[in-house]
Curated annotation (Swiss-Prot):
The keyword Transferase applies. Belongs to the methyltransferase superfamily. LCMT family. The lineage of its organism: Eukaryota, Fungi, Dikarya, Ascomycota, Pezizomycotina. It catalyses: [phosphatase 2A protein]-C-terminal L-leucine + S-adenosyl-L-methionine = [phosphatase 2A protein]-C-terminal L-leucine methyl ester + S-adenosyl-L-homocysteine. S-adenosyl-L-methionine binds at residues 97, 123, 151, 201-202, 246. Its EC number is 2.1.1.233. This is Leucine carboxyl methyltransferase 1. Transmembrane segments: none annotated. Keywords: Methyltransferase, S-adenosyl-L-methionine, Transferase. It comes from Aspergillus fumigatus (strain ATCC MYA-4609 / CBS 101355 / FGSC A1100 / Af293) (Neosartorya fumigata). GO terms for molecular function: protein C-terminal leucine carboxyl O-methyltransferase activity. Disulfide bonds: none annotated. Methylates the carboxyl group of the C-terminal leucine residue of protein phosphatase 2A catalytic subunits to form alpha-leucine ester residues. The gene is ppm1. The keyword Transferase applies. PANTHER family: LEUCINE CARBOXYL METHYLTRANSFERASE, LEUCINE CARBOXYL METHYLTRANSFERASE 1.
Length: 398
């Protein structure tokens, strides 16, 4: 396919309208152009990122309504009247990304360890994973999981409004009485025994993490005298923990993104605690398709700041190693995951949902997004928590 035939990613949506880029939506592009210089420019960029969550929820709802995914919470967390049916390659991309991360999460939770586990989702927005997980687990299993979501205050406040308005969400979270949930007057934070929603700018974690000394493998406890207090209420640094970044860190500068991950891997959690990280991000910006993708974003003031820093599968694997996740690292693009992780029967089911004529375009698009995962097994009784990840196929090469 020549460069002139590469589809403009801004048009990959039914119903027209101006698109936005949203990391959790994944296969979306576009946003108003803003000046990035100075504090006003930075604030404007933050608003662009915050405002893209609606597109993510619409893409998810589109995939659900057509039958790609089962998610009774998608409609509840999508603003009324914003539903738009996406094109088939967008729906398939949403399906593959969602099911791939779901598989990795399930292997973590189903690990041989019986210890309580913890998930921390960065830039979670309107993501439904916590609701899907809790609704699919027994009451006993639900009590063995603590789920944290971190995002800008504007997005956490919006999610809390949805929760307050939807009995389905309240029941799923087990928020049966005022005694087991705390929401401040600001309305942008929520804390309960199993679910915490944090209105925190990740860059503040990066700043606090870079200002402290990385702990050594012999450090028994991160709460040492020179350790600043953790700004994330309810996070337990002794539990086996999984971090999830669905195209979230890519909005930060390479230094900020690295400092955010290091805050968790080298400051907050001691080396003895099993810790894993799942990253979903675009890759390969330097071929013809990638350059077109980047150019489309640039015309709307969007810059995926770490894209060139972690431009390949090998760069993503190296990134995981550099963050101290030494026990294992793997990565695969979405096309590989579709071909290798999805069964033939499931491929046939998905193919029957709607006609996908743009096979070559699908392959191009899918090869420019990846899932990367890495972990450290820690020490002690829970070193097998991430053993299930060893059986999942990664992709070799770049």
């Amino acid at each position: 396919m020549s460069a002139s035939q590469i589809p403009n990613l801004n048009t990959l949506r039914r119903g027209g309208g101006r698109g936005r880029l949203r990391g959790r939506g994944g296969f979306e592009t576009g946003a108003p152009s803003e000046d990035r210089h100075g504090s006003r420019g930075l604030a404007a960029q933050d608003r662009v990122v915050q405002g893209t969550d609606n597109d993510a929820s619409v893409s998810r709802l589109s995939a659900v309504e057509i039958g790609y995914l089962e998610d009774p919470f998608a409609k509840v967390l999508t603003p009324p009247g914003s539903g738009t049916r996406r094109l088939p390659i967008i729906n398939r991309g949403t399906y593959v990304r969602t099911t791939a991360i779901d598989r990795l999460v399930a292997r973590f939770l189903e690990g041989p360890s019986q210890t309580k586990k913890q998930i921390i989702s960065l830039g979670a927005g309107s993501d439904t994973r916590v609701f899907r997980l809790l609704s699919s687990r027994s009451s006993a299993s639900s009590s063995d999981l603590i789920y944290h979501e971190i995002d800008f205050s504007a997005n956490t406040a919006a999610k809390i409004k949805f929760i307050r308005a939807a009995p389905l969400l309240q029941r799923t979270l087990g928020l049966g009485s005022a005694q087991n949930v705390a929401i401040p007057d600001s309305g942008d934070a929520l804390h309960s025994p199993t679910y915490h929603l944090h209105p925190v700018d990740l860059r503040t974690l990066a700043a606090s993490g870079s200002a402290t000394t990385s702990r050594s493998p012999s450090s028994p406890n991160p709460a040492e005298k020179d350790q600043p207090p953790c700004p994330l209420q309810g996070v337990d640094p002794t539990l086996p923990t999984l971090l999830i970044s669905e195209c979230c860190l890519v909005y930060l500068s390479p230094r900020e993104a690295a400092d955010v991950v290091d805050y968790f891997t080298k400051t907050l959690f001691p080396a003895s605690v099993p810790l894993g990280l799942i990253i979903y991000e675009p890759i390969r910006p330097d071929d013809a398709f990638g350059r077109t993708m980047v150019a489309n974003l640039a015309t709307r003031g969007i810059q995926l700041q770490t894209l060139h820093e972690y431009a390949s599968l090998e760069a993503q694997r190296r990134r995981l190693r550099e963050h101290g996740l030494h026990s294992g690292q793997a990565a695969a693009d979405i096309d590989f995951i579709w071909e290798r992780w999805v069964s033939e029967a499931e491929k046939e089911r998905v193919a029957r949902l709607e006609m996908l004529d743009e096979v070559e375009e699908w392959q191009l698009l899918a090869r420019h997004y990846c899932v990367a995962w890495g972990w450290t097994s820690g020490a002690g009784e829970d070193t097998t928590v991430f053993d299930g990840w060893k059986e999942i196929d990664g992709q070799t090469g770049d």
